[in-house]
């Protein structure tokens, strides 16, 4: 009895905070990585001096809204960063954090081309007055050699486009929910204007309008009677099937490009009957894809 009571008094097990150190060569994609991590739900601190990392971890653990994921981007922009992170990692070993190090690399040729394209000097080249771009890259590579050797994951971005780097980071540091594509199906009425945030717009005004059926007019496309009427019209189901196939192709392309959000606008005259019914039906079809998180929004419902 006493043993059971003692067990019930034990504090619940707290999951260690995920902590990620992001470092690497200037021009290798550190800012892109930071943006991707933010999209994945990480709290990202950029260009933090090494001396403050341990303190920031402590504050993150002590705060009322305890962070679950913290990433710190550190590179040679911080003049206090000499390339030695061993002592930082040692300090973190005593804290309830799961620490990993991500290192981004790229070839000298690619880094030179990237710096020339954006017309910026390398942080270690002295703006061109004290050294060349190639010398700055070489100095940084030498300075970060130990960090690279200690990294849990090294990504060479030489041949990667931004969306390909995003995919690698999502695979390594995201979860199933983060990798799910967010799709919004939005009904609207053309007489109120096109939705400003729509990626795709389809027009279902080719279907007969339930507005002219007295017993259906008061109801919306969410009602069974209106839905059955709209979907029973010639071409309605064929249109849904064809448009769904088109969306499958489009969504696959969005995923390849690293896009995680899509808004599909379905319009009729007033946004009350046809667009509502067709949006619900389209969302139902899309919802069968486990890789999509689908929601329906009826923008103009109730405006009449």
UniProtKB/Swiss-Prot annotation:
The keyword GTP-binding applies. InterPro entries: P-loop_NTPase, RapZ-like, RapZ-like_N, RapZ_C. It holds the Pfam family RapZ-like_N. Keywords: ATP-binding, GTP-binding, Nucleotide-binding. The keyword Iron-sulfur does not apply. GO terms for molecular function: ATP binding; GTP binding. SUPFAM superfamilies: P-loop containing nucleoside triphosphate hydrolases. GTP binds at residues 75-78. It comes from the Bacteria. Gene3D superfamilies: P-loop containing nucleotide triphosphate hydrolases. ATP binds at residues 24-31. Displays ATPase and GTPase activities. Belongs to the RapZ-like family. This is Nucleotide-binding protein RHA1_ro07174. It comes from Rhodococcus jostii (strain RHA1).
